[in-house]
């Protein structure tokens, strides 16, 4: 009997966090380009999407999307970047059709949903743009002087000075192959084998990182280590073919 009692208590404790989590779900979940609060949106008309979290089936009859430059403007419906107006439709994915988006800017948005006799307003969320146009890129490609037969991994390092405390900082980085980014000795990002492979004659992918916490007022150091990729294949060292 004591064993049954202990097991019962353990199950109650195990399920409490799950129940608590379910109760904290927002009434409406929002995403931009299938991401929640994404950095690095670089399309002119991103897809805004949502779904209702309800225990009972609800049929959406109409919606309204509101996009603003700031959270304050969003909450007061003032100086909106886009107001779709009330649209009678059950669509839950809509392309942004407001004023042209600016590069390197955070936008706040929310959705109002009408169901049968009820209006639901989502909590505010945001998306942040990166390089909207090719002209937004100011950087130049860098490389070392060795050919692809040189096996050691190239490393680049740059020391710079921040005159003021860092409010916000982003890093936009790409490589024709793979890279590992460091700032002040810390690895930036949790993923590997970035960026993804494409036909480099047509398109090159890049990654966006929020590096605010990695930087400091005063001296900072950024480093990049390059790995073999599609422009510098080393078959034996990468795939162990001999």
Per-segment meaning from a language model:
Residues 1-26:
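Bacterial Sec-dependent N-terminal signal peptides
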Residues 23-56, 126-133:
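Pro/Thr/Ser/Gly-rich low-complexity, intrinsically disordered linker/stalk tracts
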Residues 29, 47, 60-64, 168, ...:
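Exposed beta-strand and adjacent loop surfaces of beta-rich binding modules
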Residues 38-42, 102, 149-150:
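Short, solvent-exposed beta-strand/turn "edge" segments of beta-rich domains on protein surfaces
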Residues 50, 87, 93-94, 106-110, ...:
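Accessory beta-strand-rich segments of carbohydrate-active enzymes
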């Amino acid at each position: 009997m004591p064993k049954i009692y202990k097991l019962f208590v353990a199950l109650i404790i195990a399920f409490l966090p799950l129940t608590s989590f379910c109760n904290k779900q927002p009434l409406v979940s929002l995403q931009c380009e299938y991401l929640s609060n994404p950095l690095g949106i670089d399309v002119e008309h991103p897809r805004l999407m949502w779904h209702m979290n309800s225990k009972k089936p609800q049929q959406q009859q109409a919606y309204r999307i509101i996009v603003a430059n700031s959270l304050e403007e969003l909450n007061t419906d003032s100086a909106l970047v886009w107001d779709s107006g009330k649209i009678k439709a059950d669509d839950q994915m809509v392309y942004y059709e407001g004023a042209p988006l600016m590069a390197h800017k955070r936008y706040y948005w929310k959705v109002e949903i009408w169901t049968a006799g009820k209006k639901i307003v989502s909590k505010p969320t945001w998306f942040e743009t990166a390089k909207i146009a090719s002209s937004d890129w100011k950087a130049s490609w860098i490389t070392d002087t060795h050919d692809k037969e040189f096996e050691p991994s190239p490393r680049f390092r740059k020391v710079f000075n921040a005159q003021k405390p860092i409010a916000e900082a982003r890093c936009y980085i790409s490589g024709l192959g793979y890279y590992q980014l460091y700032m002040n000795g810390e690895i930036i990002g949790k993923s590997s084998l970035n960026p993804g492979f494409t036909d480099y004659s047509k398109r090159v992918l890049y990654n966006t990182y929020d590096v605010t916490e990695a930087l400091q007022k005063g001296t900072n150091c950024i480093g990049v280590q390059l790995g073999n990729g599609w422009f510098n294949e080393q078959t034996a060292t990468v795939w162990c073919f001999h």
